UniProtKB/Swiss-Prot annotation:
GO molecular function, one term: metal ion binding
Pfam families: Cyt-b5
Binding site for FAD: A298, G753, G754, E755
Induction field: Expression is positively regulated by the apicidin F cluster-specific transcription factor apf2 that binds to the eight-base-pair motif 5'-TGACGTGA-3' called the 'Api-box' that is found in all promoters of the apicidin F cluster except in the promoter region of apf2 itself.
Example GO biological process: L-tryptophan catabolic process to kynurenine
The enzyme's E.C. designation: 1.-.-.-
UniProt organism field: Gibberella fujikuroi (strain CBS 195.34 / IMI 58289 / NRRL A-6831) (Bakanae and foot rot disease fungus)
GO cellular component: cytoplasm
Domain of life: Eukaryota
Domain Cytochrome b5 heme-binding, residue spans: 716-793
Pathway the protein contributes to: Secondary metabolite biosynthesis
Residues annotated as domain FAD-binding FR-type: 429-548
Cofactor(s) for this UniProt protein: FAD
Designated name of the protein: Cytochrome b5-like reductase apf12
Length: 961
């Protein structure tokens, strides 16, 4: 293994290769024992019998293996790193799922403590000093092992004593204890990313674990690969003289923009099943023993390094900033902590700019970099809102105390918003940069009136742009009257002399274009300017629309554009040197004269041969319009785009990207999802229908922004809360936002946040959750304007308590739906088994449901008999499940085929249970709604009957095991 420079990632151990490099002997045998247990750990975790596997390993370890491990680890740092990953992982796994306080098996703990004394530089320094003091000659591996274990145990005894005395250890001692109890989450630095099959094996290849852990390294690797670390290593010296180094710093800040933007896109693509994540990784990653550090947030060192470089918005003194960063980077390797310390103690660029002494160019370059950093934190804030779903799955604790909040969503939103204000100030939109704009007519009417124009912007400093991004433009329409609008970037021009890697989809550009229709005050102003004019701009990235491209010759990607929106695809194609597989570009326009960018379209159509197929569909073609296209390169036809899409999409289509108005985009989604000409009906689907949670949706939409009040439609039908409550199943999703009701059944097919976030509030009021993520987003308003179906009648009836009960029932049912829909439920295939979630997920789903239903029964005041029966039936089902999985482990663990089939039967039994519960709930909901609509109070016996049916379902499930 190589040696990492300050701030750089340490090399990844070659876990599978190491047995071939370790000399024969006890050390190699010990490594192979642990390596084999790691390979089987995920399979044992599936049925919750991992502790038996780990106990068997621990009983097979001893003094000889400890000394041998020390011997080979002292000779090879790569072996030491591998042992560190494996032993910390096994300790964390032993304590999962955190139902009670346990002690790590003795020999496993001893081996883990000793390897940490060798692996962690701070602990190693303590060990070396002790060994040198005890032995005049070179210490033997046995002496080193004994000293390491003795020092570690002394630290633990000291920590135990202070805890029993209700006092605290000195900070420097507690930091060393924290390193002794370093979690496997802390070892992601020396594990590969999620594509490495030998890393992050705590739960086999469970997506929620490998992506959460592995993305941390992949994000940091991207930041490092695109010069982020190399520039930060130079920053402390460059900041010593801002005046002399201003031009170098401007170039550095531009490169840091690109590095952060590419890392942000990788982080955005990290999607998970939140309930599964909450019951697996979130519980697994908590500290054990006397460690004072919990799991913490999911931010990698890039966040903290950029915090150190950019400082706080309030220019707080550097000592306070250093203390904060030191606290947040306690688990980082020493080299990363050293770089952070160097950055934060160097002269502050923010202070230099605030003093008024910075050059104009440096000020603009810093603002541009802050734009990307701000968006990075905004994206992190929105993704963190999904923690609420994980909490509902039964996670009982978080390091930040979110679970104790009355409203977790508001707690998370306020906490992260405060963090953003600390970094960017009270007005985070402030980091705009100056630009100069020119308007050029693109399309005119027969009378010469400008209908569409190209607006070109020259930026005062390079901005990081990817195809599909938008530009937030502030323009002074009248003296002192500034208006802000957001437009899609149609073309971007790289700065002179810049270069990019083959797979790089982001560049620092010096100028960009937008295409604007002459409608509305600001757009009309932009279109009709005769001379250049100053503006202020800010990039609005669109990571949800990032075009990934094909990776195989057999893959296809479909682009669908409406009119001038084709420019987004043309911009991406212009940046490609070659294409892999097939790309189909379908463009719709009224006629040839209304087809914007026709010249570029014709040019690009002949640039990639058979890899790019262009179709133009004209809805109202003029005479000779079809014949004007060059034969062979562009295929032209008449009609509506949706009438032709069935010919262009195939089962090999990897993803479909749609650009245009909201109505156009939704028509395309509807057409490709259901087939052209199909009338939309509420589908009869199971609440357990398949769901994809491991990747972004197939459809990626980039729609034109609407006005702020675009969803205010007249003559909307009145929809009661009772009717709303009946639409909370997959394929039939309604939500209320304020006083309006929306049918969002199509949204899961393109929602970047996944379907479970939508199901969370299906059939209920969702304004509070919506505002924390999408407030003020005009693009979302455009889509909602096409989905509004009525106005919510919020008047409370005579039996208002039953309306509250109904809302609670919907909430409970939504949780049950979310917790029971699993992408990789066992199928009986041994190849798929490693990606399946553990049986603990099923236990968590029923626990959450029973807890919620019991609360409903107590709230309704129907007596304790129903609650007692429900709890008793549930306990019987859990006990039967526990006994069954123990038997499966004992009888089938060594036979993967039988094991896979046994797991499938367990999950099938759970599916039958959930279907039965949903049937009972649906009938109860209909009864309540029918009675309330008729003006009668529902009978409490209906709750008794439903509860009895649910209890019976639980008892039948117990027998099925």
């Amino acid at each position: 293994m190589g040696i990492a420079q300050p701030g750089e990632l340490a090399p990844v151990p070659r876990f599978r290769h190491l047995p071939f490099t370790i000399p024969n002997g006890i050390g190699r045998d010990t490594y192979l024992k642990i390596h084999n247990v790691m390979n089987h750990l995920g399979r044992a975790v599936l049925v919750g019998q991992h502790r038996r596997l780990i106990q068997a390993l621990s009983s097979d370890l001893g003094v000889d293996s400890l000394v041998a491990m020390v011997s080979i680890s002292m000779q090879d740092s790569e072996v030491c790193s591998a042992f560190s990953v494996y032993l910390t992982t096994l300790e964390q796994a032993y304590h999962w799922p955190r139902e009670s306080t346990l002690s790590t098996p003795e020999q496993l703990e001893d081996h883990k403590l000793v390897i940490q004394m060798l692996q962690q530089p701070e602990l190693r320094d303590t060990l070396v000093a002790s060994v040198h003091a005890q032995y005049d000659h070179s210490a033997t591996p046995a002496q080193v092992a004994l000293s390491a274990l003795s020092i570690a145990k002394q630290m633990i005894d000291q920590a135990t004593e202070t805890r029993s005395n209700k006092t605290k250890l000195p900070t420097e001692i507690q930091d060393l204890v924290n390193l002794l109890y370093r979690t496997s989450r802390g070892d992601w630095f020396i594990q590969g990313n999620y594509t490495d099959p030998d890393s992050h094996k705590e739960f086999g290849r469970l997506h929620e674990v490998i992506r959460t852990n592995g993305t941390q390294r992949s994000v940091q690797e991207i930041f490092q690969r695109f010069n982020g670390i190399s520039w930060l290593q130079r920053m402390p010296l460059l900041h010593q003289n801002f005046a002399s180094n201003s031009s170098i710093l401007c170039a550095a800040y531009a490169d840091l923009q690109v590095a952060m933007a590419l890392a942000r896109d990788e982080l955005f693509s990290m999607v998970i099943d939140e309930p599964i994540w909450g019951l697996t990784f979130a519980k697994f990653s908590k500290g054990v023993g006397l460690c004072t550090i919990g799991a913490g947030g999911a931010d990698c060192p890039m966040f903290r390094m950029m915090d150190a470089l950019c400082g706080r918005a309030d220019n707080i003194n550097q000592a306070a900033l250093l203390d904060e960063l030191d606290f947040r980077s306690r688990f980082f390797p020493p080299g990363m902590r050293a770089l952070i310390n160097d950055l934060v103690t160097a002269p502050s660029v923010r202070s230099h700019i605030s003093s008024g002494e910075a050059s104009y160019e440096l000020t603009q370059a810093f603002r541009a970099m802050e734009q990307i950093r701000y968006d990075l934190y905004e994206m992190h804030r929105k993704k963190a809102m999904r923690i609420a779903l994980a909490l509902r799955a039964g996670q009982q604790a978080t390091s930040s105390g979110v679970q104790n909040a009355t409203t977790p969503e508001k707690y998370i939103a306020s906490t992260l918003s405060a963090a953003i204000k600390v970094r960017f100030g009270q007005e985070p939109a402030r980091p705009q940069v100056d630009a100069f704009a020119w308007s050029t007519p693109l399309l005119c009417s027969d009378t010469g009136v400008i209908q569409t124009s190209r607006i070109q912007f020259v930026f005062s400093t390079p901005l990081a742009v990817s195809p599909g991004d938008s530009l937030r433009v502030a323009v002074e329409v009248e003296q002192g009257d500034w208006h802000i609008r957001t437009y899609s970037i149609t073309h971007a021009y790289a700065r002179q002399g810049s270069s990019k890697a083959r797979d790089q989809i982001c560049q620092a550009v010096g100028s960009a274009e937008i295409c604007v229709r002459s409608k509305g005050q600001v757009s009309s102003f932009l279109c009709n300017q005769k001379t250049g004019f100053p503006v202020r701009v800010m990039i609005k990235p669109a990571p949800h629309f990032r075009i990934a491209g094909n990776t195989s010759p057999h893959e296809e990607t479909l682009f669908v554009a409406q009119g001038g929106a084709v420019c987004v695809f043309l911009a991406w194609l212009a940046w490609q040197k070659q294409l892999v597989g097939t790309y189909r570009l379908v463009v719709g326009a009224r006629n040839y004269n209304m087809l914007a960018y026709v010249g570029q379209l014709e040019k690009i159509s002949s640039s990639f041969g058979s890899h790019l197929i262009v179709h133009v569909v004209l809805s109202r073609p003029g005479h000779g319009d079809i014949q004007r296209f060059v034969p062979g390169n562009i295929k032209a036809s008449t009609g509506r785009v949706t009438h032709h899409l069935g010919l262009f999409s195939s089962c090999s289509t990897k993803a479909t990207y749609v650009c245009g108005s909201a109505s156009f985009a939704l028509d395309v989604v509807r057409c490709l999802s259901q087939g052209p000409g199909t009338k939309r009906e509420v589908p009869k689907v199971s609440r357990l229908q398949p769901i994809v949670t491991s990747r972004l949706p197939h459809f990626r939409l980039h729609v034109a922004a609407a006005t702020e009040n675009g969803t205010d439609k007249p003559c909307l039908n009145q929809i009661t809360k009772l009717e709303l409550a009946l639409h909370n199943s997959p394929g039939d999703l309604w939500i209320a936002l304020g006083d309006r009701v929306f049918d969002i059944s199509q949204v899961p097919s393109f929602h970047p946040g996944g379907e479970k976030v939508l199901m969370y509030r299906a059939g209920r009021q969702a304004q509070d959750v919506f505002d924390t993520v999408h407030e003020g987003c005009y693009m979302i308003s455009s889509l909602l304007n096409e989905m509004v179906i009525g106005r919510l009648d919020s008047a409370r009836g005579e039996f208002s308590q039953w309306e509250d009960y109904l809302d609670k029932i919907v909430e409970i049912q939504n949780d049950l739906t979310n917790h029971s829909r699993i992408e990789q439920a066992p199928t009986g295939s041994i190849e798929q088994l490693a990606e399946s979630p553990p049986v603990e997920i099923l236990r968590g789903a029923t626990n959450c449901f029973v807890k919620g239903w019991s609360s409903l029964l107590q709230q309704s005041g129907i007596g304790d008999s129903g609650v007692v029966s429900l709890l008793s039936s549930h306990q019987d089902a859990i006990s039967a499940l526990d006994a069954h999985v123990r038997m499966v482990y004992e009888n089938d663990f060594e036979d993967p085929v039988r094991y896979a089939n046994a797991l499938r039967k367990i999950f099938d039994a759970h599916s039958r249970l959930v279907c039965g519960i949903h049937t009972a709930i649906d009938e109860l909901k209909r009864h309540i709604v029918e009675r309330l609509v008729e003006g009668d109070e529902p009978e409490l016996t209906s709750l008794h009957i439903s509860t009895a049916r649910i209890s019976q379902q639980l008892r039948e499930t117990s027998k099925s095991y």
